[in-house]
Swiss-Prot record:
Biological role stated in the UniProt entry: Regulates microtubule function in seed development. Required for development of both embryo and endosperm tissue. Not essential for cell viability. Probably involved in the binding of beta-tubulin in the multimeric supercomplex.
Subunit structure: Supercomplex made of cofactors A to E. Cofactors A and D function by capturing and stabilizing tubulin in a quasi-native conformation. Cofactor E binds to the cofactor D-tubulin complex; interaction with cofactor C then causes the release of tubulin polypeptides that are committed to the native state.
Protein name: Tubulin-folding cofactor D
GO cellular component: plasmodesma
Gene source species: Arabidopsis thaliana (Mouse-ear cress)
Keywords on record: Chaperone
Gene Ontology MF terms: beta-tubulin binding; GTPase activator activity; tubulin binding
Pfam families, per database record: ARM_TBCD, TFCD_C
GO terms under biological process: embryo development ending in seed dormancy; microtubule-based process; post-chaperonin tubulin folding pathway; protein folding; tubulin complex assembly
Note: Belongs to the PILZ group of genes that disrupt, when mutated, the microtubule cytoskeleton and produce mushroom-shaped ('pilz' in German) embryos.
Amino acid sequence: MASRAEEMSPTKIEIETAVKIEEEEDDEHDSKERVLQRYFLQEWKLVKSLLDDIVSNGRVVDPTSVHKIRSIMDKYQEQGQLVEPYLESIVSPLMFIIRSKTVDLEAKPDEILEIIKPISIIIYALVTVCGYKAVIKFFPHQVSDLELAVLLLEKCHSTNSVSALRQESTGEMEAKCVTLLWLSILVLVPFDISSVDTSIADDKTFGVDDLAPLVLKILGFCKDYLCSAGPMRRISGLLLSKLLTRPDMGKAFSSFFEWTYEVLSCKEDSVTNHFRLLGVMEALSAIFKTASRKVLLDVLPIVLNDVTVLSKSNAAAKSSLLRKYLIKLTQRIGLVCLPHRSPSWRYVAQTASLSENMSTSSSQRLAPDHTVTAILQPESLDDQEDEDMDVPEILEEIIEMLLSGLRDTDTVVRWSAAKGIGRVTSRLTSVLSDEVLSSVLELFSPGEGDGSWHGGCLALAELARRGLLLPRSFPLVVPVIVKALHYDVRRGPHSVGSHVRDAAAYVCWAFGRAYSHKDMKNVLDQLAPDLLIVGSFDREVNCRRAAAAAFQENVGRQGNYPHGIDIVSIADYFSLSSRVNSYLQVAVSIAQYEGYLYPFVDELLYNKICHWDKSLRELAAEALAPLVKYEPKHFANYVLEKLIPCTLSTDLCMRHGATLAAGEVVLALHQCGYVLSADSQKRMAGIVPSIEKARLYRGKGGEIMRLAVSRFIECISLSHVTLAERTERILLDTLTENLRHPNSQIQNAAVSAVKQLVQSYLVGNDKKSVDLILKHLKHLTDPNVAVRRGSALALGVLPYELLTAKWKDIVLKLCSACKIEVNPEDRDAEARVNAVKGLTSVCETLTQKRASDPGNDDLSLFLLIKTEVMDTLLKALDDYSVDNRGDVGSWVREAAVHGLEKCTYILCKKMETYSEGDYNDDTSSLFDSNLATRLIGGMLKQGVEKMDKLRETAAKVLQRILYHKSVSVPHVPYREKLEEILPNKANLQWAVPAFSFPRFVQLLKLRCYSKEVMSGLVISIGGLQDSLRKASLVALLEYMREGEAKDPKEQQSRESALGDDILWILQEYKKCDRVMVPCLQTIEILFSSKIFLNQESYTFSFYAGVMDSLAIELRASKDFTKLKAGLAILGYIASVSHFISTKAFSQLLSFLGHRYPMIRKAAAEQVYLALLQNGILVTEEKMEKVIEIISESCWEADMETTKTQRLELCELAGLDHEVVFKTRNRLVIKDIAGNKSAADENASYSSLVDSSGF
């Protein structure tokens, strides 16, 4: 039974848990909390557990919990409203701890402060997220707390902050801020503060008019904090505004203003005084916001005078924050001067009442504007009182200061001034408000700067939002807003005005919210095209989005605007994020609706194609083309007539944009089927000769004009504009000059133009065609590298009709141009890249035309591609040229990889056109197994080298070759294995070494590919890039260990094959340091990984081959990395118990007399290690003496000393020192003899160190 009861106990526990849950659900707060935690504060459970731990312990036990809570709250910095439902649950218990601990503060001040500081950090984090107004609602506010809070502030004030960095904050600053906020609530107690201050009871000297000690303490602390640069300055100003505006604080109020007068009158120019000024201004602003008019009227003239003087001082000129506070205080002084009233003349847009609508008949249910009714209050006695209102004389000065604030250079000052204009105007009469409006409109004069326009827009928006801008003023305001929407002033290499356009869009947004449909109908008709122009064509994304938001607001609030919903769905927040998408997609879609096409065209024509930004001009010209289809006649008769004269403008921006735009429009007209008149075609044909005649390619802007002219020629060629023979020659000469230009962009644009020009005008003219080809063939060997680059590209785009006459010469010349130039001064990687691309294009052009002719059985072209082109491209894979830009040969290799792919398809397609009966020796040999092996091997080599991009390119090309859907590539050795390693999957990460190398090393098993794979692999293993070296080495070692795990014979087979491949590399790349250095480093790493140390028969032949290579490679070498790797290899071989170790040991001893001290030292280390591991090198009785000489000699000393020690070692080792010397002579003495001038070995050594990068 007992066991049965124990089995039942979990059920009992579940029942008890359910009862607890039901009890919790009865609690209204907990229920709301569970609902909110799913939708608002996602981390509430964690926060709650941390808070419960703090509350239960009465302090923060784990300091990391504070950091966790603060990190969570920081995530809600921009959405504080999500945290507000939890504030009471967080703040109340924490403040209860602070209050309870403060009671014992005098007894244990330091200990209590250490408890309060971390709690204050949490509360202050909530203040920064939710704002102080939301947080202080849950602060305790009993009368007795006032003295406790002042005591706590006194203790905190006497503690200096350890650090100002937030990450290192220990809570001093947060504790002061929280205490000041707590006092801002407590000083509002509805009793005389002197009656709360217990210290007065024992003070018999305290008089009736004296200030309570508590008040004096608070005032003293606040004055100190007003000099602070932290948040205490702002909070102390808030506290002062609450304290000094109490009815019983008249004397404190007067004394504080006397102190502020002294501060504002101080001329001291120091950092402390600057922050004191900011604090005083902030405190005065808070006081003028809180205090009653009656209290402030007495001090108002003095404060205004101080503000006027200070606004003209150097301190204000230097500090935008000070100017902001001056403007804020000025507007509040103005509000104090005027009685608070809601002006009867104000415009009010009132939403129709649902209950009223329900009570009316269905015929009268809807107002004319459907939802909003404008209310202008009728004239009454109140209006007469408004007009008779006495306006203080100082108000004019205040408004003038606010208007000057609208011209300020800083946005924060202008924004504060705009709000001040709105607030002050709301208390003025209708006549005076019109005067204010007139003054604001004066800010939009042409002579004003961008700051004035921006401030004016902000002020207009504020007036509109408050209903202070009446509809009768729209005729004056709307034209100004339209100008502001297009405000863009050029200043040097840039322009200003984006903030003005953004503010103008804000004004339009405010209009939509403030006014009824019937008042806004005509205004919206005027503003809509301009808003959409800004939304579609503005350079800045924030302006485009602001204009689109303003249009959306107006459409949503102003009723049925034509096509409004459709346009809003097109021009949304995301579609406008891309400038290209805005120009080419959004604008084109909007232009289809009535009323937008012509404004859009005019904007592009008059403002955008002459824009200072080159990319924007190009985009504007491109954007004109898709608009042509809506009104071709307008573009042909009007737009082109405007553009043609502009192509010769003295303004570079204008002529560049006009040339581009003219070409794009002509091409778009052609695509629409619109035929230009003969006169228009003649004028278009004369643009380029006119530019030539005006010599507009020279001087500033010549390069971008060449780009524009090339694009223009391409467009008119595609449009088949009628050209005279002389004009054709001029255009061709122009493009030839552009092809010679060193700028690659100009060359590429010229190549595109040549392709279309030749296709449209030179096909069929044999003489011109041959001359053109011969000229470019000659240019392929021109000393000027830019000429070679351009001609190679030009030959690649010529049509079949031109290529067929000289096809063999062209192919052979381009093959020759792909090879590395013999003269180092003539070498140019870009020329070879272009030659490879041109050669590939020529082959494609020639074969495509011939493939479409079934009667053409001539295989000479295809055989030439196989023998010459493929061989040239395979050799281009070995282009490892390097200059000051790095591995520029990689550009050639990448182009060759793509070229090989295309030529492979050409040959395989040709083979597929023949049936089995039609095969002959020539046909079957177009693509044989030998060529396939060379092709795949070359690709695989690129797939395991050090360039990430090239590895990815090679792997993807191999994938396409293996899995091409329409072309089958035959005779690929081990195709199944290749398909296993390179699966037909997209998005494989071939550029990631950890992914690609483990796959490619498996190909070392295949003897037909292993040499190429290994020759690329050693480059990666011995390279400088650490991550690449590690990934490639791990892949190789895992491959070798995998064989060992399977079968020892498999391991030996793999080692033997690997050794053969390495020996092949050593012979193939003899004296080529690019390969030899990493190859030697790879051998060293393999030896260190216990590979090739198993003393099988093949390993000894491997040792012999490596040593033969080392004898050649280390001879007269000055490469420290190479020498060090070679010595390490000799050391490993010398450690093997075989007769070959004696030879390696002898070579190591020869390096003990090397002229470089570091090499002698490295050789000595290897000799020492070899002796420890191989006992046959020296007899046992001599071993101790040899070890002693090696370890105790200074091998970095002078060479004569080291030679003596080496001689002694040779005698002890039983080696004929003359043989060793002869070996050394054969290795390095020749180099020493050839450099007798280098008498100082340290000088030579320093050069070695410099060249080695140490």
